[in-house]
Amino acid sequence: MFWVLVLLSFIVLIGDGMISEGAGLRPRYVDVGAIFSLGTLQGEVTNIAMKAAEEDVNSDPSFLGGSKLRITTYDAKRNGFLTIMGALQFMETDAVAIIGPQTSIMAHVLSHLANELSVPMLSFTALDPSLSALQFPFFVQTAPSDLFLMRAIAEMISYYGWSEVIALYNDDDNSRNGITALGDELEGRRCKISYKAVLPLDVVITSPREIINELVKIQGMESRVIIVNTFPKTGKKIFEEAQKLGMMEKGYVWIATTWLTSLLDSVNPLPAKTAESLRGVLTLRIHTPNSKKKKDFVARWNKLSNGTVGLNVYGLYAYDTVWIIARAVKRLLDSRANISFSSDPKLTSMKGGGSLNLGALSIFDQGSQFLDYIVNTNMTGVTGQIQFLPDRSMIQPSYDIINVVDDGFRQIGYWSNHSGLSIIPPESLYKKLSNRSSSNQHLNNVTWPGGTSETPRGWVFPNNGRRLRIGVPDRASFKEFVSRLDGSNKVQGYAIDVFEAAVKLISYPVPHEFVLFGDGLKNPNFNEFVNNVTIGVFDAVVGDIAIVTKRTRIVDFTQPYIESGLVVVAPVTKLNDTPWAFLRPFTPPMWAVTAAFFLIVGSVIWILEHRINDEFRGPPRKQIVTILWFSFSTMFFSHRENTVSTLGRAVLLIWLFVVLIITSSYTASLTSILTVQQLNSPIRGVDTLISSSGRVGFQVGSYAENYMIDELNIARSRLVPLGSPKEYAAALQNGTVAAIVDERPYVDLFLSEFCGFAIRGQEFTRSGWGFAFPRDSPLAIDMSTAILGLSETGQLQKIHDKWLSRSNCSNLNGSVSDEDSEQLKLRSFWGLFLVCGISCFIALFIYFFKIVRDFFRHGKYDEEATVPSPESSRSKSLQTFLAYFDEKEDESKRRMKRKRNDDLSLKPSRPI
């Protein structure tokens, strides 16, 4: 019996050894390190969440096949050195992964260690956009990178129409690189960071006065949109000091990054002082869908935290990060790979290390395989779908946009990389096509600082007491637009009145002073004038400034306050106005022939209708009136007499067509004569100007000179500079130039005084005049809105009429004779008259042939009554024919029929 017991004991020992050796493939514990500052808000929340995840993973022994996940948290105590020591400690204890570090500064340092020892490092708080997978392949961000956070903020700024922002941030990698990313995103939207206020890392402890100093600087600046990218403790202090300085009032815009939402979620309620200082602030939170998993975890939180701290989004990502590691461990163990570590030859070969035990740092042999399992994770966690893109960024990054209000905070919308700004949850939009158009971007109403719901302008004039220097051209001609008052530096004119009226419509004061540019002896060069805005000589320039492409590249223009464009002016003559102007369209022969045909056609119709139409019968006087009335009423197609004969209708139809052509031509010609001036120059527009060899005048200082040389390829030798309207007129009259090219407003003013000239052809450029401001100047936008307001209310037109609506033109440089005018001549219509005449002749021929035939057939009965002499016989026949012609056809037929019957009754009857 004793030996049996010994044998059984030996078998058990052997079995235990075999089991232990086999179980080596699945270790009892898989170690994971975590490095956080547990005294911080993030550290406290993430530590609780990681422990909960560890318990959930280990609650199912089958998940890791009997192995357990063991997470050891190292408290870095906000100290960089301790953070490094914690990482080294985990590398010595064979940790397969490290969760952390908490800050991007340490992530940059420790990522080199992770790369060397092949230990994956996962962080959901170190979200620096510069931590790339190419540089640090073993560093994985398990929450959306701050690159997307800055993209969301940039789209918000663009959505509200702000062009400049101020960045206030701590001098650390995460904050600094985040602001750099923001600057890049803003630049693509024509916005910019106008000032960067950098605060030391420990500013609250070591130099709190530095916060006040920076806020005072910001207070005196132009921009009122401030981005705060810092830590919760620093951020709280910033807003408290800003409130004391009156910077949480109407007009300011404050946007805080995700640090504020973590504070709002975890500390509830906030201290009254802090809550009051945050009213009206916008902030963002990483979006996590409201899934059942999330709701269940939120419900557990109070029990997990014992009510000491609220759950924020970093707690959710901490929980999911543990599960990412656990699933990767499961896949590694399921692949039957041993979890093993080996010495790093680079470290073991180091000599003179003193007491440093660098040889204890070992390489994770399966690190690359384990990393591959991590980045290929595809799971649904409490934060939603977890999946990495090829560049290691999280799939479908999105944010909640939060507005801090009196009773806490409220959500005003979302941002997602898929669809931009929306009031619909991003997960509802992922199945739709991406639409990033401005019309598809929406957010709900915001309560801004100061309690206002009106979107702040985002900028004010700098509070430095300096007035804006507004450049004004000191013109030598066309002073209706801009001119210096005699004996002073004051200015007046159309452009000045428009500017002053627009300034009055702006809802804030615009202190300014006008500064003259030029000597007043000749017009200044406007390209140089505009360039002075770029180099800072002027804060803006006002005047008759054409908006052209070259200038828009260096300055921003307002909405045009007057339309403009280049036109060609050439000499003309004009017909003298007379009471008989209505006779000008036709030459005298044309009038005579037209009048004759009215009478001829009327007579022909009377002849054709006289015997059969009662309306063309009656006493001679009535018939003459009928002929005249019918003839001339056809001019207006208002004749009331009906034609019943076929021939009459045919003639009338042809005549009405002729009348239609004549009246239409008359109307068009009269309109042209009364409204269009007549040329005595071969220049008919820009095309003939280019092809001609004549000299061309232009206004000194105008862009027309460069345009003709560069765009129209007109030789510089053909161009003649002119300085005033009088020089224009003299040059055109004496033939110095064949034409002048200038902008339309100048030309209109010139023609109102000198009427012997006219615009030839159409405007061959389209532009306008505006006021120029520095690039991205918010004042340019407000001035444009004000100019539109002036236009809509009619005030802009009143200013125009005050300065430009005048006409002193009384002397004419010539007149146009009948031969030179565009009168309608007979040769243009002889074909119509010929057709009408032939039709009348044919109709009369047919008619007389028919009536003569009928007369000789029936009229002989009248002649048989007497046998006169030959002379009297011819006279009697003519009288009989005329009587027959004048007799109504029906009566003639009845008379002839009656006479025939009488003749038959007088013949003797034949005997029976």
Curated annotation (Swiss-Prot):
Pfam families: ANF_receptor, Lig_chan, SBP_bac_3. InterPro entries: ANF_lig-bd_rcpt (IPR001828), GABAb_receptor_plant_PBP1 (IPR044440), Ionotropic_Glu_rcpt (IPR015683), Iontro_rcpt_C (IPR001320), Iontropic_Glu_rcpt_pln (IPR017103), Peripla_BP_I (IPR028082), Solute-binding_3/MltF_N (IPR001638). Disulfide bonds join 755-809. It is found in: Cell membrane. The keyword Ion transport applies. Disruption phenotype: Overproduction and aberrant placement of lateral root primordia. Gene3D superfamilies: 1.10.287.70, 3.40.50.2300, Periplasmic binding protein-like II. Residues 1-22 form the signal peptide. Expressed in leaves and siliques, and at lower level in flowers and roots. Detected in the vascular tissues of both shoots and roots. Expressed in root phloem. Glycine binds at residues 544-546, 551, 703, 743-746. Its main location: membrane. Glycans are attached at residues 306, 338, 378, 417, 435, 445, 532, 734, 808, 813. Residues 23-587, 671-828 are extracellular. It comes from the Eukaryota. Residues 609-617, 639-649, 850-912 are cytoplasmic. The keyword Disulfide bond applies. GO terms for molecular function: calcium channel activity; glutamate receptor activity; ligand-gated monoatomic ion channel activity. Keywords: Cell membrane, Disulfide bond, Glycoprotein, Ion channel, Ion transport, Ligand-gated ion channel, Membrane, Receptor, Signal, Transmembrane, Transmembrane helix, Transport. Overexpression of the gene leads to calcium deficiency and hypersensitivity to potassium and sodium. Glutamate-gated receptor that probably acts as a non-selective cation channel. May be involved in light-signal transduction and calcium homeostasis via the regulation of calcium influx into cells. Could play a role in calcium unloading from the xylem vessels. Acts as a negative regulator of lateral root initiation and development. May restrict primordia numbers and position along the root axis by a signaling process originating in the phloem. This is Glutamate receptor 3.2. The gene is GLR3.2.
